[in-house]
Swiss-Prot record:
Top-rank taxon: Eukaryota
Keyword Magnesium attributed: yes
Coiled-coil intervals: 47-72
Residue sites binding substrate per the record: D13, L14, N15, T46, N47, K179
Gene that produces this protein: Hdhd2
Protein name: Haloacid dehalogenase-like hydrolase domain-containing protein 2
């Protein structure tokens, strides 16, 4: 790992770290204000595919988080960038609330499959349609491959198991655009004009948030909220730079030890 430099940016996960669905993590709003009062740039990075960036921003504002749209980098944005780069016509296996992120994208006569978290669409008929497109040579683009995520009623299957099922059935490999992919973190940091060695990632997912960030040279802080389960910090190597109770505790550490 490259030598550490002065801290310039903090990347923060959203669901599970700042909030869990429509409930804020206790103390998160005030902690974010304290972090913003420093010289570091704060950006929000999320694999959320259940809703558009606009809807996500409205949810955060209702929870009294002071966040602007241009501060949020989502895996939906990364997926659209790849679709445009490859000039494909995707079959969109995404939640209907996420469709505004793909406005203007040609989907007639699809020659690619894009899959995110879409519980209402993960049924045999649509998955079989995707399967047949892939057999005909269509590329598979996974917005992310999270195993599960946190809801108010408990943990729930993420898109990862469904992506893996299509990979297995068609003997193909998905192109993944969200966390923990290196390109996702690098794109988020590019906007902040920041090198990985000048940044910290805070999240509740040991693999997608912490391991992904640390693989490009960032420091990773794992919080014990959201999808965190006991001993998650032991599942990755190297382990997280820090494991703490919640986002406010992570901010306390940054203010006391990294600035």
């Amino acid at each position: 790992m490259a030598a550490r430099r002065a801290l310039k940016a903090v990347l923060v996960d959203l669901n599970g770290t700042l909030h869990i669905e429509d409930a804020a993590v206790p103390g998160a709003q005030e902690a974010l204000k304290r972090l913003r009062a420093t010289s570091v740039m704060v950006r929000f990075v999320t694999n959320t595919t259940k809703e558009s960036k606009k809807d996500l921003l409205e949810r955060l504002k209702k929870l009294e988080f002071e966040i602007s749209e241009d501060e949020i980098f989502t895996s939906l944005t990364a997926a659209r960038n790849l679709i445009e780069q490859k000039q494909v016509r995707p079959m969109l296996l995404v939640d209907d609330r996420a469709l505004p992120e793909f406005t203007g994208v040609q989907t007639q006569d699809p020659n690619a499959v894009v899959i995110g978290l879409a519980p209402e669409h993960f049924h045999y008929q649509l998955l079989n349609q995707a399967f047949r497109l892939l057999l005909d040579g269509a590329p598979l683009i996974a917005i992310h491959k999270a195993r599960y995520y946190k809801r108010k009623d408990g943990l729930a299957l993420g898109p990862g198991p469904f992506v893996t099922a299509l990979e297995y059935a068609t003997d193909t490999k998905a192109m993944v655009v969200g966390k923990p992919e290196k390109t996702f973190f690098l794109e988020a940091l590019r906007d902040a004009d920041c090198a990985p060695e000048e940044a910290v990632m805070i999240g509740d997912d040991c693999r997608d948030d912490v391991d992904g960030a640390q693989n490009i040279g960032m420091l990773g802080i794992l919080v014990k909220t959201g999808k965190y389960k006991a001993a998650d910090e032991e599942k990755i190597n190297p382990p997280p730079y820090l494991t703490c109770e919640s986002f406010p505790h992570a901010v306390d550490h940054i203010l006391q030890h990294l600035l």
